[in-house]
Amino acid sequence: MGKIRILHVVQAAGGVDRYIRMLLKYFDKDKFENVLVCSQDFQEEDYDGLVNSFEQIEMNRAIGAKDIKSIGEVRKLIRKYNPDIVYAHSSKAGAIARVADIGLKNHCVYNPHGWAFNMRCSDKKRMMYTAIEKIAAPFCEKIICISDAEKQSALEKRICKENKLQVIFNGVDIEAYENGEHGKVKKADLNIPEDAFVVGMVGRISLQKAPDVFVKMAKLVKEKVSNAHFIIVGNGNQETEIRKYAEDNGFADSLHITGWVDDPMSYVELFDAACLLSRWEGFGLVLPEYMMAGKPIVASNVDAIPNLIKDGGNGLLVEVDDTVGASEAVLRIHQEIELRDKLIAHGYEDVHRRFNARRVSEEHEALFEEMLK
């Protein structure tokens, strides 16, 4: 038997881009050949050495008439490469690829990377997203869920039968981090004093990641810890409001927003407490990244996050939109050294045991080989 050829279709960049690169890095190249069909948001040089072929077509996040053209182009590429498996990533590419693959003689797998119907949106949109997933579900053989919570959501919404769902927990590239360069970013680079207590978050400055809760929490922490500083690693459409809140409340000099960066872990290394206060979350990849860096975690008790974080074990959980609870959790990390050390130790153990990128690739390989038997 020759190599198994997988054709990946992906529209959304960001976290999905990072996931695919990590997945491809640890695939057995003696057994698998990978083709990437992606949107204009991807960079070909990022995939040097990871894929055998790179194809770029126009795919847009919004639903529209251009989707018909995207479907046609994906179908042409499926015919051109004749893969054993089409692997569709995220909801938009998932719909496009599954429709494009109808009637073709290969296997099809879909990974939503977080269900669109779990987003905080209008009931009308939620119903539309749910309907699209139900309609498209018969056109693939397996749906990969990145957490148990994602699988449960699919069952509750009756997207498909349980035997179509396969949980493959997300992971992080521990080897690359541990063998990489550390200390590239210094506190002084951000005008943060060396003795500052630094609280940080990594994520888009948008509704999902709750930067408004983070900055309100920051105000409460600053009132108790005068040398506290706060870092947001990311960019997004709420940045102006976040900066204005800090300015209006007198701590603008203590809030540092990096914008989009190539290496967020360089900034995570500065954190004394690491937050993910999301309003919804399919997995929360930054959580094992925090663990990998040895950071105590404060996270929201929502969706997949409790699958990763056990309150008082490898992190502290607070309710969604609970500004006071988040500030109290951060203050506990500041004040209780034994608790902080315990959270760090348990997190470090968990990330090595449960969230290693090699395991993610190996579980995919096993699934694909089983499908082709």
Protein language model annotation of sequence segments:
Residues D311-G312, L316-T323, R332-I337:
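Conserved acidic donor-binding segment of nucleotide-sugar-dependent glycosyltransferases
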Residues F139-K164, V172-A176:
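A short, active-site helix/loop in glycosyltransferases that binds the activated sugar's phosphate group
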Residues G325, R332, L339-R354, V360-A366:
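A short, well-ordered alpha-helix in the C-terminal region of glycosyltransferases
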Residues D17-M22, F197, M201-E223, F230, ...:
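A conserved mid-protein helix/loop that constitutes part of the nucleotide-sugar donor-binding site
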Residues W260, R279:
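Aromatic "clamp/platform" in nucleotide-sugar-dependent glycosyltransferases that forms part
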Residues P296-A299, I309:
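Short hydrophobic beta-strand element within catalytic cores of glycosyltransferases
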Residues A88-G94, P112:
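Short His-centered aromatic/hydrophobic patch
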Residues L7-S70, A149-S153, R158, N237:
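N-terminal strand-loop element at the rim of the active site
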